Amino acid sequence: MLPRRVDRRQFVISGFTLAGSTILAGAAGCSADEITSIPASTGSSLEHSALADSDLAEPPVIQSIGGRLSAGITCGTTPVWVGGRRAREPVTYNGLFPAPTLWVRPGDTIDLTFSNKIVFDQAETKPGYGRPPRTSHTTNLHFHGMHVSPGGTADNMLVMVSANGHQRYLFQVPANHPAGLFWYHAHVHGLVTNHVGRGAAGMIYVANSYTDQVTRLGIRHRLMMLQQAYFEDDRSRLISDDGERDDPDLALSLINGQLMPDIRMQPGETQVWSLLNGSTSAFYVLRLEGHAFTVVAIDGVPLISPRVDQETLMLSSGQRMEVIVSANSNKGRYTLSYDAYDQGVDTWPHKAVANVLIGGKAWVGGSHPGVDTSSPVSDLSTASVPDELHRTIALSQDDAVPEGEFGRFTINGHAWDPAVSEWTSTLGTVEEWLITNDTNQDHPFHVHVNPFQVIKVNGSPVAFSGHQDVAIVPRFGSITVRTRFTDFTGGPVLMHCHILDHEDMGMMTRFEIA
């Protein structure tokens, strides 16, 4: 018998122990028996595999109570189901693919006890790789896009958790933090692709009164992590795409760990989709047959006005979008797919990734309120920026270094060195960065802690729409961004290419804030 379907809004668990960690949240109309029926599409346990490739399910939610989210997160390598296959040697959190979603509100405290239980069956090194072997057991956590401290027990990338080690991540979400989709994932340099590519990632959603309003209107809110999965030739061992088997044509394109799930809508229904490109390197050009999207937020930050009638959505690795989808009145099956995209070196093929099934009675619900205006962002293009706060960040490729080896990719002429800081920025200032790309491929550029505003692409001004933490720097081109340092001193604050193998090969650097 198939386990009972559990809607994300219902799946908030009270005192339920999941893979060695206690999930503390308020139960929402579920008995204990109902709660333990975890949809298999999350990769939770082998006996639930029958639900793979069926209706889209979402990872279980760990929700804050009384202003605090307290939970255990265990990173391990126990086999899980991925896209309907039993996968050996994943790297998952709490045995789930994707990991549990952390659901918090501005002002909440996040208190995670993180345990490293990574065990690989086979020794595996790559000669000349110049970075840790893929079987290294060291790991940590990065809270991608979250505007929290880069030091201490928060988003500190110098923290390393060794095998069988533990780390407490304890920090507060600022009271003025924007509502939207963020994520957490492994971030040890040299191992990022290997761990994230095998599943070490989960979503974070920051909710506020705007989120509550959408819920009261009866509008369904779906969270979707878009991923690629690669398997060895025997189709059982999950591997990453860091040179082991990195042909985009061989990847399984997954949503919430499922292969070609069904997304159900009623005729005329409005839904909100929060989308995360949680892949290590893929560029997704998302298209829904017969429908258009309305974009209301990018990288967890609301736009100043919605982008309507968008036939496609472009998401590079690490990017998020929140979109409104309105089903048309014609019942039937519509394909959600990726258009082909030429990144310069890799070409990501056209692929169907889900079926949207429109059926049943016509939907009766409220109108979506549009963009969230509770946390407005400032247009930095009009700010006065002195010459000394204009900086250049050069993304380059050293062709003398073989493909796959450390030093292949660089920023400002050098590969990642944790002891080298580019500069120290001053709290309260606005800086302008020219980010150049002299390589033959597009690079998604990501900055930790502080979002930025793109003001130019290839020297041409860009109209103000909002702030983001990932932006594509076009091949042989540039972007110009501005960023304001409003909180948090210290560091390190990292910036890097979010093609994670490029980061692992050196395209990352750091700065501090004082």
Task: Identify the residue ranges that each predicted region occupies.
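Histidine- and aromatic-rich segments of cupredoxin/plastocyanin-like copper-binding domains
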Residues: 150-155, 160-162, 230-375, 462
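Long, hydrophobic, well-ordered secondary-structure blocks that form the structural core
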Residues: 164, 172-213
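Extracytoplasmic beta-sandwich strand-turn segments characteristic of Greek-key/jelly-roll folds
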Residues: 102, 133-177, 295-329, 416-425, ...
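N-terminal, post-signal-peptide metal-ligating segments of extracellular/periplasmic oxidoreductases
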Residues: 2-24, 30-168, 240-273, 303-305, ...
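Histidine-centered catalytic micro-motifs
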Residues: 141-146, 177, 182-191, 433, ...
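Short solvent-exposed strand-capping/beta-turn motif centered on an Asx-Ser/Thr pair
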Residues: 115-119, 276-281, 436-440
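Extended terminal and domain-junction accessory segments
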Residues: 14, 26, 31-72, 76, ...
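Short, hydrophobic/aromatic beta-strand segments
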Residues: 121-130, 137, 282-289, 443-447
